[in-house]
C-alpha cells in the first residue's frame, strides 16, 4: 500500500508566491560595441552564450570593470546601471531580459540578494539542456 508523500513548502516558495517576478525578453543574438542598460525599477538577467565581454559599473560596491571570458549568467536583481563593451567585429551572443519584482525596490527577495551575481554556466550541472531550449525559442 502506498502512502502519499507530504511535502512541506520551503520558505522561499512562500516568498516567491507573494512577491512574483516577471521577466520580459528584449534581446537575443549578437551585441557589438557599447550597450548601456539603465531601466528604473527593473533588474536584468543576461546570459552570455558565447564570446567574451568587458562589463563596467559606476555604482558603489561593484567592480568598476570586469572581464567575462566564458558563457555566464549575469543577474542584477535590482536597478544597477551597467555597460557592456563588446568588440565591434566579434559580437558576443546574448539572451537578455528585464526583471520586474512585485513590490519594486522593496521586494524582500531582490533586497536580500547581492547587486550582481555572475555564474559561469559550466558550474551548473544539467543547465546545458535547459539553455538549449531557451535559446531555441
Per-region residue spans from a language model:
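Basic, amphipathic alpha-helical hairpins
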Residues: 133-137
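N-terminal regulatory/effector-sensing and dimerization cores
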Residues: 24-116, 123-126
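An acidic intrinsically disordered interaction segment
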Residues: 11-17, 119-126
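Basic, alpha-helical interaction scaffolds
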Residues: 129-131
Amino acid at each position: 500500500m502506498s502512502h502519499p508523500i507530504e511535502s512541506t513548502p520551503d520558505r522561499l516558495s512562500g516568498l516567491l508566491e507573494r512577491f512574483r517576478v516577471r521577466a520580459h525578453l528584449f534581446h537575443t543574438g549578437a551585441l557589438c560595441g557599447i550597450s548601456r542598460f539603465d531601466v528604473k525599477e527593473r533588474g536584468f538577467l543576461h546570459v552570455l552564450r558565447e564570446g567574451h565581454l568587458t562589463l563596467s559599473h559606476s555604482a558603489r560596491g561593484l567592480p568598476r570593470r570586469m572581464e567575462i571570458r566564458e558563457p555566464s549568467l549575469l543577474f542584477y536583481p535590482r536597478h544597477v546601471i551597467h555597460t557592456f563593451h563588446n568588440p565591434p567585429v566579434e559580437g558576443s551572443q546574448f539572451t537578455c531580459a528585464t526583471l520586474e519584482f512585485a513590490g519594486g525596490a522593496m521586494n524582500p527577495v531582490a533586497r536580500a540578494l547581492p547587486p550582481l551575481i555572475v555564474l559561469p554556466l559550466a558550474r551548473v550541472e544539467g543547465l546545458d539542456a535547459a539553455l538549449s531550449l531557451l535559446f531555441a525559442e
